[in-house]
């Protein structure tokens, strides 16, 4: 896993594929009936295309796992959001940059894993992790997040398509 994370760091530092937001999550969007705006670009920089997608997916996966035992309808909504994001991204990438899109999708999964781990044990904890800490249920929740984060990193190639990503996420469970 260390080699994979080092590889992701190298890509982040050296692959200037696009201007990226650098901190993309569900709170980065303002939406109304007519438009979507992305806000808070203070971490924007040149970087790998898969980084922002990975950060957004991590945020959604953490939320999904947080609600998995008590809100099935909301979890289905999260799966639909992940599906819509990934299927649109996959379609657009495969048309516009066909020889690189698979790598970008795989990198997105791996970056999602690193972001889940960072938001689980780092300084900037996910709100869901803090809530579980307050409830005293943090050990199992954090363990599950770390397992998922590690799987996204070490098995990122298995998440390399929208269909495979959704299948693997639907298999998540809470111990």
For the regions a language model picked out, list residue spans one by one.
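Active-site activation/catalytic loop segments of kinase-like enzymes and analogous catalytic loops
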Residues: 50-96, 112-130
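ATP-dependent phospho-/nucleotidyl transfer catalytic cores
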Residues: 1-21, 32
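Surface-exposed helix-capping loop/turn segments at secondary-structure junctions
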Residues: 91-100, 157-160
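ATP/Mg2+ or Mg2+-diphosphate-binding catalytic cores
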Residues: 113-175
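Active-site-proximal structural scaffolding
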Residues: 13, 17, 22, 46-49, ...
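All-alpha amphipathic helical-bundle segments outside canonical DNA-binding/catalytic cores
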Residues: 97-112
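Catalytic activation segment of kinase domains across protein kinase-like and atypical kinase folds
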Residues: 26-67
């Amino acid at each position: 896993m260390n080699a994979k994370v080092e590889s992701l760091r190298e890509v982040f530092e050296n692959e200037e594929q696009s201007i990226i937001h650098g901190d993309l999550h569900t709170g980065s969007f303002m939406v109304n009936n007519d438009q979507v705006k992305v806000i808070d670009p203070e971490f924007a920089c040149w970087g790998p295309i898969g980084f922002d997608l990975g950060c957004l997916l991590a945020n959604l996966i953490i939320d999904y796992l947080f609600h998995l035992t008590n809100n099935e309808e909301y979890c289905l909504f999260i799966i639909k959001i992940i599906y819509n994001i990934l299927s649109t991204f996959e379609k657009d990438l495969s048309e516009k940059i066909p020889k690189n899109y698979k790598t970008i999708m795989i990198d997105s999964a791996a970056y999602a894993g690193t972001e889940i781990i960072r938001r689980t044990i780092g300084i900037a904890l996910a709100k869901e992790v803090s809530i579980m800490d307050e409830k005293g249920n943090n050990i199992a929740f954090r363990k599950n997040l770390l397992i998922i984060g590690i799987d996204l990193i070490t098995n990122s190639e298995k998440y390399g398509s929208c269909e495979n990503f959704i299948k693997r996420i639907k298999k998540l469970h809470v111990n």
